[in-house]
Every structure is written in C-alpha cells, then in structure tokens.
Amino acid sequence: MTVAVRFAPSPTGLLHIGNLRAALTNWLFARKAGGSFLFRLDDTDEERSTPEFAAAIEEDLRWLGLDWDRFARESDRYGRYDAAVAALKRAGRLYPCYETAEELALKRAALLSQGRPPIYDRAALRLGDADRARLEAEGRRPHWRFRLEPGEIVWDDLIQGHKSFQAADLSDPVLIREDGRPLYTLTSVVDDQDFAITHIIRGEDHVTNTAVQVQLFQALAEAEGQGGVPVFAHFPLIAGAEGEGLSKRLGSFSLRSLREQGVEPLALCSYMAKLGTSDAIEARLSLAELAAEFDLARMGRGTPRFDPEELARLNAQVLHAQPFAAVQERLRALGLDGADDAFWLAVRPNLTRLADALDWWQVAHAPLTPVIGDTAFAAAAAELLPSEPWGPETWGAWTAAVKERTGAKGKALFLPLRLALTAREHGPELKTLLPLIGRERALKRLSGRTA
C-alpha cells in the first residue's frame, strides 16, 4: 500500500500553529513512508472563504518548504459531490429535513435542560409525502441528513488507540444545506475516497466527526462500489503557554505573524515536529532530517503547550548553523549589501533573529556614541591599540598590553572596552568584531567621540 495523506485547510483565515501541526505531521508521515502528500482547499464555505486566504495558505506552505504532490480545490468538484449525493439517496441513506435553525435550537435547548444529549430526534423520518408537500408549499426547502445505521462504530487510532462509539449516541449529520450545497462532512469523505487517501491524521477535535465519517465511508463504498475506510490518527490540540486554546484568527500565532517576527521556517518546523513527542526538542537543519526521525508512535496524548521562548531558542540554533551563502541574499534584502563572510561569522553567534544582524552592522559601520566610564583607562587603551592590518591575534595582544598598563583584569578590563567600542554590555566576541570596526573608528570611540 502506498501511503497517501492530505492537508485540507479551509481558506477562511490565516494558518496558525495548530494548522501547521496538521500540515507538518502529515507531510513528515508521507515523506518518511515514501508516500504522497495532497494539498486540498476545503472552500465550500463560500461566505467565508476568500482567494486572499487561499493565497496566504499556499504562501505559508511554500515558506515552510512543505511541498505537495497533488492539489485539489473542493469548489471545482461540485459535480462529483452531486453524484455522491445521488448514490446515497438511491441507497436510502439520505433523508430530507425541514426544521429551521430556530426550531433545531429550541429542540437542542430543551434536551440540554433535561440533562439529555442534544441528539437529533429524527422527526423528519416520520413525515409523509403530504407533510413534505405542505412544508415545501410554505416555502421551506429541505436540508439532508445522513442516516446512521444502529450499532457500534470502531476504529484503531494510531495515536488514541481503540475508539468506540454507539451510533445511537450521535446525531445524523447534515450533509446538504437548504440551498443544495454540500457540507464538509460529505465533501471531505468523497475527496478522501477519490484521491485514495490511506491515512487521515488530524486533531482530536475531529474524533466524534470521525465516528460519523466511518459510516459515511462505508456507505459511499457500498453505494458506488469503490473505496474503503482509511486509517485514522488524532493528535492532541496545542494550547498556548498558559494553557489557553488557539484559533487561526488569533493573530499572534498565525504563521504570517511568526514569519514577520523573524522566525526561521526550519526552527518552527523543528519545534512543531517534536512538540508533544518523547523526543528532545532541538533544531534540525533540514526537513529531510525531521522526516527521517519522524515516528507517529512517539506522539503523546497530553496537551502540548506552545512556548515562544523555546521557539526563540531553536531559532537561534538554526541561525547559528547557517553559512554565509545561505543568508547572503536575505542580508541584502535588509540593506546589508556590504555584508561578507567575516561579518556573518562575527555576528552569527549572537543572533536570535536574522534582522538582529542589522544592529551589529550599524555597530561596526555607523556612527555610534561610545560609553566611557574611565577616560584614563580609555586613553591608555587607545594609545596601545596596534596599527593595522589586524589578525586573529590582535585582540589578545592588545588586551594583554592594556591589562599590563592599567592593572585591570577580567570584567574590569573587558567591559569598559566593549562599552567604548560598541556602547553595549553584551555582543559578539570583540576579537572578531574589532577588525570590522577598524582602527580609525575605534580610536575615535575610545576618545569619547561619536564615530
């Protein structure tokens, strides 16, 4: 069996990290197994779906490096859904219902007030032809429900283990709206059968939906003479750092927002691939590495929490491992046309975001007001500063001479030099940064002048 999985977002908002977990888990599963990855837009919610959100989803996937083998758009497949509906009607598995949304809400409220589950009472099945004709004469148009067969619905979930539902505890799902358009529960199953999806890996908020869809898969396979029931896996949903739920409309956790904040795609994928698993969370330098290490069996059942600080740590790890050639064009996009390998190697260990390189470029090349605490110390350091050209040994020789002249050592030696040369208490190693600053600028700063 060739593994086939899918990522099927609705273009009704920006992708967030919860969506990323679904996309990445499916992508890694497919690549590890040598299978195929389908990117499908579930865009039948025409009121809320927009081309802008569809384009943003594609942009996010490309930014992450999650390529796809096949693409589908549900709005292109209405004719296929009509055929599936006709087959289910012929099989007697769909029935028309005429309750309004208000009437259904009243039924639901009444059941809940009695402490009973809000399961649809199948009142529509008791309507006769005359009743239906009368309701339609009043202007009502039916929505169509899928009739669940009585009995136990079971599957072996790759993450949750054995799952079991009684059909009597579930409402017959609405598959067709009053205007004739199909709903997700139907379109998703039809697509999964047509594209021969072997594994459906998604969030645990779909578990009850899966129970319904298992019967729908079976009914369609019977009615159309093809297809079967895929293997299911339901992973826990991600919470925020404080345990709060996430939404794709929560802007701070959207992939676009994270990208704009300077998050590296490999850092994000490394974090999300390991979050909630038994693996240590460390950065990987390629998606191929993540795929080779991926194992669905390592995914736990507890609720993982998304920690921005942990992501920042991995972001730094990814940047610190990048050669200059990998970031050269991105540095140019930041306006650092003169950046070279020496600059990158000097500042790389101190970056948590690539944009931080701009700050250190300005330290090395732009006017800066130094911080001088002891003018005599700074004057001695300036007097002892060697002539250029400078090499790797220049910093050590210079600081040794300053130490001998002033008696300063340790922090009392190095911090005043750093403040004078960079106006900062922390930063890249000065033995690599000093040659970038240059002797002329260094002398001016040691004398207290802006340079």
UniProtKB/Swiss-Prot annotation:
| PANTHER family listed in its UniProt record | GLUTAMATE--TRNA LIGASE, GLUTAMATE--TRNA LIGASE, MITOCHONDRIAL-RELATED
- Top enzyme category: ligase
Q: Which family does it belong to?
A: Belongs to the class-I aminoacyl-tRNA synthetase family. Glutamate--tRNA ligase type 1 subfamily.
Q: Where in the cell is it found?
A: Cytoplasm
Matching NCBIfam families: gltX_bact
* HAMAP family registered for this protein in UniProt: Glu_tRNA_synth_type1 (MF_00022)
Q: Kindly state one GO CC term assigned in the UniProt record.
A: cytoplasm
The reaction(s) this protein catalyses: tRNA(Glu) + L-glutamate + ATP = L-glutamyl-tRNA(Glu) + AMP + diphosphate
> The motif 'KMSKS' region: which residues?
245-249
Its EC number(s)? 6.1.1.17
Which InterPro entries does the protein's record reference? aa-tRNA-synth_I_cd-bd, aa-tRNA-synth_I_codon-bd_sub2, aa-tRNA-synth_I_CS, aa_tRNA-synth_I_cd-bd_sf, Glu-tRNA-ligase_bac/mito, Glu/Gln-tRNA-synth, Glu/Gln-tRNA-synth_Ib_cat-dom, GluQ/Sye
**Regions that span the bilayer:** none
Which GO molecular function annotations are given, in alphabetical order?
ATP binding; glutamate-tRNA ligase activity; tRNA binding; zinc ion binding
What is this protein's function per UniProt?
Catalyzes the attachment of glutamate to tRNA(Glu) in a two-step reaction: glutamate is first activated by ATP to form Glu-AMP and then transferred to the acceptor end of tRNA(Glu).
In terms of CDD domains, this protein maps to: GluRS_core
Name of the protein: Glutamate--tRNA ligase 1
Q: Which Pfam families match?
A: Anticodon_2 (PF19269), tRNA-synt_1c (PF00749)
Please list the residues that bind ATP.
Answer: 248
Q: How does it assemble?
A: Monomer.
**Short motif 'HIGH' region, span:** 9-19
Primary localization: cytoplasm
Entry keywords, A to Z: Aminoacyl-tRNA synthetase, ATP-binding, Cytoplasm, Ligase, Nucleotide-binding, Protein biosynthesis
Its GO biological process annotations read:
glutamyl-tRNA aminoacylation
